Design a protein with these regions (language model features):
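N-terminal, active-site-proximal structural segment of metallo-dependent hydrolase catalytic domains
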Residues: 1-78, 82, 87-94, 269-275
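Soluble or luminal CAZymes and related metallo-dependent hydrolases
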Residues: 30-37, 64, 68, 122-124, ...
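Active site of divalent-metal-dependent phosphoester/diester hydrolases
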Residues: 61-65, 78-102, 121-123, 179-255
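A short C-terminal boundary segment appended to hydrolase-like catalytic domains
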Residues: 245, 249-275
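Active-site beta-strand/loop signature of hydrolases that rely on acidic residues for catalysis
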Residues: 17-23, 38-64, 103, 130, ...
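Beta-strand-turn-beta hairpins that frame and shape the catalytic cleft
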Residues: 5-19, 96-100, 104-109, 122-144, ...
């Protein structure tokens, strides 16, 4: 005899805080690797899931090899996943595999790293994804990427690869440094670059554009002029967006050349739990 049960639905789901943060190769604006500083920013923001860009893992400094990603996760009591894009020689005696990372208060599973399309003259970029397997974000897949810094045409090619990869998934969100200036006000809505127009056409909502507080500029951290760090959700799941803001403060100014973006989100009312 076969039995079945109705899908569980989410009612008054607890919110989760999602963060995207380019950590500038572990080097603050003062060129120091300061894990206490980074940990305090993430902890004070109450972040549950964090997408990191420009992560070296492991990193060799002055002949010694360190694993700051693992140590940062340990300090925050978080799990982590890393997806390399290539190799970086940041400076004399400072080098290692570089890419994106995820930190999560909840278990992560099925982490995958996808190398994105590129032009012959451009650096390799990647997309890291992992399923969140516990807590109020269970059933959500987190993706983090870092697009080319030089040319919108290259970024457009890369985001097409991102969209193709994410199309295989159910509920998910995408964060990262897109190196593409975002919507900053009513008069710029029609001037969105092709990358952001393509995401909108594919049915993705820019979280800050929907529920953002304050100016939202993320770069450069000491005197931000543009918003190039984003969180996107498919429109179906974007109904759960509650707030978005770029962090500020003296510690944030020194910790990286970017400001982190923090978004609060909950499962939309009545959505069924993924199997």
């Amino acid at each position: 005899m076969r039995t079945s049960s109705l899908p569980e639905t989410r009612r008054d789901s607890a919110p989760v805080r999602l963060m995207t943060y380019n950590i500038h190769r572990w080097a603050g604006r003062d060129q120091r690797l300061d894990l206490d500083r980074l940990a305090s920013i993430i902890r004070d923001a109450g972040a549950d899931v964090v997408g990191l860009n420009e992560v070296l893992h492991p990193v060799t400094m002055n002949g010694r090899t360190y694993a700051p990603l693992a140590e940062l996760a340990d300090r925050l009591d978080m799990r982590y996943a890393f997806g390399p894009s290539g190799w970086l020689d940041y400076g004399p005696g400072w080098h290692g595999p570089v890419g994106n990372a995820l930190l999560s208060r909840f278990p992560l599973r099925d982490a995958t790293n996808t190398l994105l399309p590129r032009l012959p003259s451009s650096k390799q970029r990647s997309l890291l994804g992992a399923a969140i397997a516990g807590g109020p974000a269970r059933g959500l897949t987190a993706f983090v990427t870092h697009l080319d810094h030089a040319f919108e045409g290259t970024r457009l090619l890369q985001i097409q690869g991102v969209l193709k990869r994410m199309a295989q998934h159910g509920p998910h969100f995408l964060v990262g440094d897109f190196n593409t200036p975002g919507f900053m006000g009513r008069n710029t809505r029609l001037l969105l670059p092709p990358v952001l127009r393509l995401l909108a056409a594919a049915g993705y909502q820019d979280a800050f554009c929907a529920v953002g507080n304050g100016p939202g500029r993320t770069f450069p951290s000491h005197s931000p002029l543009v918003r190039i760090d984003f969180l996107f959700l498919p429109l179906r799941w974007a109904r759960g967006l509650r707030s978005a803001r770029a962090l500020s403060g003296n510690v944030t100014y020194q910790a990286s050349d970017h400001r982190p973006l923090v978004v609060e989100w909950a499962w939309p009312q009545g959505e069924a739990l993924p199997a």
